[in-house]
Amino acid sequence: MSKYNLSLGYLDNLNHEIPEITSLKDRFEHTYIIGKTGMGKSSLLEHMVSYDINKDLAVIFIDPKGDSCKRIYQGIKDKSKVKYISIASPVVINPLNKEGYKIDNLVQEFIQILDVLVTLTSSNPESTVLMREIISRAMKSIRKEQDKNIEYLTKLLIYPDERQKLKGTLQKGSDLYKYWEEFDSKGNRNYQRVECAQRVASRLFEISTGEMKDFVIGKNELDISELVNKKQVLLVDTSRMNRNSRIYLSNLIVYSVLSYCEFARPHKNPLMVYVDEFQIVVSRLFSDLLARSRNSKVGFILAHQNFQQIPRDILGAIFGNVGTSVCFRCGDEEASRFAPIFGVKTSDLFNLPKYFAWVRIGINNTLIETYPPKIKDVPDFEIPTLKSDFNFLGNQWIAI
């Protein structure tokens, strides 16, 4: 690859440092972008993504509006390396049936995804403790390959007769056998289990039977290792999806990246992961994700609108893990946080003109005007459909 030199915009003040990231390693320190809607975040993200693609890097871009995905796709010359995922162009991402992972690793990944889904959509997120227990036992009990999917898991959580059938496939007297034998027996603890299972199933039922069905039923079709090794581009357009579907799909992909960082070896090629409106993938583990991904040559670029969207402790942990910060026009609270960092007044931040931003790369602060979008209007084209020769993966769990 030729020399890496990502310019973020035009220099507004000649006394400031040139707004350039001149080392690919600095991208693995991650980038945080904040600003009100319509101030230029999307244009900056599109510029950064296009640069990385032209540098032949593997890229994942998660876009809740879909417009940026379309503009980026339109600007890519070699579309053979692009996978465009949308409600009209689904790809199966089955966290219950992935090749090359131990069952405990799959359990961990899926529970992280459900944690975020339940936390963002439930008034009782504390129930996730019991949820972890139930999901872990369920995934470790499923033996038939055709049952390793969310559709069957949902039935298992809802119907006692399905649990009895599953118990019959287990070794009598084993811990898993005893767990399901006691699950539906009378008792306050068991009542809580059944109630929790039904709450989780209600969310999974919507996913496994609604608009997301084509994303979750079948053999897993997305391998992050393959995407990185082949330097492919994954554009994820979550527009036209309901909120739960958007949360679930975004987290499926982000926490697949976490599993890639933790368990896949070696990490030869870099991967850039862009998440616009990243509050829908935030969890207590997110700071760990940023810290671990750095050593795996994975750089995250996270954008959102205001602090109210993310719990304070998680936001603070994110600030401690990013090497580049970009602040467009923002509210008073956000301006108060960033003004001392950039060495300016709060009014300088919440009065920034459109497409202007303060940038901190390492320890250098710069006021910039971001580059104008190369494609202003959203292209009108038929959303690409993934071909049938998509590389399917195996469906074996590794014994432990």
Locate predicted features.
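Alpha-helix capping and helix-coil boundary motifs
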Residues: 19, 98-109, 149, 380-400
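Conserved H-loop
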Residues: 64, 298, 303-309
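C-terminal regions of RecA-like/P-loop NTPase motor modules
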Residues: 1-4, 307-400
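P-loop NTPase motor domains
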Residues: 2-17, 24-26, 31-298, 314, ...
